[in-house]
Amino acid sequence: MLGWVRKRFCSDLAIDLGTTSTQIGLPGEGIRIDEPSVVAVPRGSHRVVGRGAAVGKLAYQMLGRTPEGITAVRPLRHGVISDFELCETMLRYFIRKACGQTMGLRPRVIIAVPGCITPVERRAVFNSAERAGAGRVWLIEESKAAGIGAGLPVSEPLASMICDIGGGTTEVAVLSLADIVASQSIRTAGDTMDDAIVRYLRRRYSLRIGEQTAEQLKIAIGSAAPLDHELTHEVSGLDTASGIPRK
C-alpha cells in the first residue's frame, strides 16, 4: 500500500548534477529533465529573475548576453558546488519540474558525484538536495553510474573501463563485481576545452566569442581521435579592437 502511495504522489529520481547540465531520470520513463546548470540573478543578489523561472534553458540563453544588472551564474564549478544557495534553488526548480503535479511526498533521490570530491563537498551536495525538497538521498560515483547506464557488465567478474568526460570533471575507472577497482578523476573537462577555444580565437584571430559559441564549435568539429581530413566551421563574434561583429 505504501509503495502505491509513493508511486502515486512522488517519484524516485536519479540526478546527474553536472557543471554544464543537469539531468533527472525517472524509473521506467528515462530522462525527463535535461537542462543547463545555469541560474540568472540580479548582480549581487541570489533572487532568481523572471519570478524564479530563469533557471536552466532560459538562463542559459542569457550566458554572455545578459542585460546590464543581470548575470547568468553556474552554481557548480569542476563538478562541485560553488554557490550553495543558488544550487539549492536550481535543484528545487528541477525536482519540482520533474515531479510535476504528482509531487506530494518528498522524492527519494540518488545523485551522481565526481570521484575526486572531498567529504565536505559530498556533504554539501547531500545537504543541498535535502534542502531542495528531496527525502532520502544517496550519492553514487559518476563513473559507476555511467558504467551502469552504458550497459557494461559491471556486476560480472570482468574488467570494464569507462571514460566519462563531463563539463567540469573527467572520470576514468575500471569496474568489476559491482565496484570500482581503480579510478582517476581530474578537474579538466569540457569547460576547459571551451575556454581554450575562446582564448585561441581571441589570440589567433582577434575574435571574441561567448561560451555557447565555443561549445557549438567544439561539438561541430571536435574529435576524440585523429581525422582523415580537418573539419572547418564558420564562427561569428566581435572584433577585439573595434567591437564590430564579424566572422
Which residues are covered by each model-predicted region?
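Nucleotide/phosphate-binding catalytic cleft detector across ATP-hydrolyzing
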Residues: 1-165, 173-247
